[in-house]
Amino acid sequence: MPDTTGGHPAALKVVTLDGPAGVGKTTLARRVADALGIPYLDTGAMFRTMAWRLGPDGPDLDEALLRDRLAGFIFTLRGRGGASVLSCNGEDIGNEIRTEDVGAMASRIAALPVVRECLKAAQQRMGAAQPLVVEGRDMGTVVFPGARHKFFLDAAPEIRAMRRYTQLQTMGEAHDLALLTEQIRSRDEQDRNRAVAPLRPAADAIIVDTGDLDIDGVFGVIMQHIRSRDGL
């Protein structure tokens, strides 16, 4: 298993951004990666890709069969900054995984220990090979507990639902705001109460409430902490 406790030089440069859906993790992770000139890894896209490829019956597969299927997914990362591209089995991951249905399936498979075990190993391999900005739900607590910089982003469900509603509109998808709010509350409960790698901030994470700040404001807070600690 790769050393994620700080012994590997690259591990010192891992920046983790954790938090629930709708707090701006993706946008912020891309910007931070651009500012630092290092690759960006969207771990949520890895779960979504597995869910999309496994299909609706994926979470119900026999564990041995599921483990065999998971072994066939090879993730690679190329490029730097926000333009980093994640691929699965040689195919770039696109917007086909960004639907609400795929997100719901991803939340289900994310609760399975065998799935988290598989992706944790893949993510740690990437972090051991190079500095990274990673976003997810358990990056600072489980995958990269020795990361030099850890942030946990949060906001009220209503604020996050509105952000998601606006995002889906730009993608040409129509959704009911009240339903989105309820879905976010439900996913929060599922993510925070699951037995494996529940959503929670690391003990040494900087907690940022994104509800009262725009993207520029949150980005400024994150970069100030990074530069202060690194003496930049």
UniProtKB/Swiss-Prot annotation:
It catalyses: CMP + ATP = CDP + ADP; dCMP + ATP = dCDP + ADP. Keywords: ATP-binding, Cytoplasm, Kinase, Nucleotide-binding, Transferase. It is an enzyme of class 2 (transferase). Its main location: cytoplasm. It is found in: Cytoplasm. InterPro entries: Cytidylate_kin, Cytidylate_kinase_dom, P-loop_NTPase. ATP binds at G19, P20, A21, G22, V23, G24, K25, T26, T27. CDD domains: CMPK. One of its GO terms (molecular function) is ATP binding. Signal peptide: none annotated. Its EC number is 2.7.4.25. GO terms for cellular component: cytosol. Pfam families: Cytidylate_kin. GO terms for biological process: nucleobase-containing small molecule interconversion; pyrimidine nucleotide metabolic process. Belongs to the cytidylate kinase family. Type 1 subfamily. HAMAP family: Cytidyl_kinase_type1. NCBIfam families: cmk (TIGR00017). This is Cytidylate kinase. It comes from Nitratidesulfovibrio vulgaris (strain DP4). The gene is cmk.
